[in-house]
Amino acid sequence: MNLNYLDFEQPIAVLEGKIQELQLVGTDNDLNISEEIDRLKEKSTKLTENIYSSLTPWQIVQVARHPQRPYSADYIARMFDDWDELHGDRHFGDDKAIIGGVGRLNGRPVMVIGEEKGRSVKEKVERNFGMPKPEGYRKALRLMEMAERFKMPVLTLIDTPGAYPGIDSEERGISESIAQNLAVMSRLRTPIICTVIGEGSSGGALAIGVGDYLNMLQYSTYFVISPEGCANIIWKTVEKAPLAAEAMGVTSSVLEELGIVDETIAEPLGGAHRDIDTMAEKLKTRLSEQLDQLVAEDMDSLLERRYKRLMSYGNAAS
């Protein structure tokens, strides 16, 4: 896979370009330049470690939005056996910005629900760039209630720039659909684990984000409004987005300190897009371990703790 490098990764891109040039020269001329290639690879690894050890919140926002970052569909394909996608909300239609269905995680039946941005231009349009409409959240709700009936745990994968704010979305009750999901998820009698895999923005993320565990991948973000939106409101210019990202505390490390996030799951060096298979295996292992803990707990105690957790959001005294 040819990687797209972000602005702050350009020194890495230069080194990787030299490595590729030397590899081509070695192939064409049968020259033994493996030692030089190994030296440059080691240098590139150290440079990547150095850059990624001190990322700013705004740089982490960029990594979370990386065009090659794995989406929900990528994780589902790698983590779940016997996957069977389910469609429609039984009220209006099938929103492709939300994908959901039944699969097996290490043999255990689970209901998986994820927000999906789409990879190609055509797919991005079909999936509305990962911005669900009311029918998407109602589809998610239908699948969660089905999971409760069949005693299957629910796993959600959060990755959205936000719920779709268009007129048609408002006409069909986007606010009500989000609120209904919050209410039902808070009392759903089955374990729920939520994981932010990319962008977790506003009510669009929270609508499938109420659970017993909330994980964030290391370079994912979670916020009430995008840094650009915040900057535009407060400073009247998007150029202040880096400052807004810093002030809002959008990263997993800050949110874990605040008690909003339970666990940060480490990503491969350079981000999840550098090694999707390794990231998927790591996430699969951790979700399986968390499910083992949750299914062993008393359901009433689980629900009480889940509800208290939801009510504590935004409470400075919690």
From Swiss-Prot:
Gene name for this UniProt entry: accA
Name of the protein in question: Acetyl-coenzyme A carboxylase carboxyl transferase subunit alpha
Pfam families, per database record: ACCA
NCBIfam families: accA (TIGR00513), AccA_sub (NF041504), PRK05724.1 (NF004344)
SUPFAM superfamilies: ClpP/crotonase (SSF52096)
GO cellular component, one term: acetyl-CoA carboxylase complex
Family per similarity comment: Belongs to the AccA family.
Domain of life of the native organism: Bacteria
Positions of the CoA carboxyltransferase C-terminal domain: 36-293
An MF annotation (GO) of this entry: acetyl-CoA carboxylase activity
Native source species: Teredinibacter turnerae (strain ATCC 39867 / T7901)
Chemical reaction(s) catalysed: N(6)-carboxybiotinyl-L-lysyl-[protein] + acetyl-CoA = N(6)-biotinyl-L-lysyl-[protein] + malonyl-CoA
Intracellular or extracellular location(s): Cytoplasm
Coiled-coil ranges per UniProt: none
EC primary class: transferase
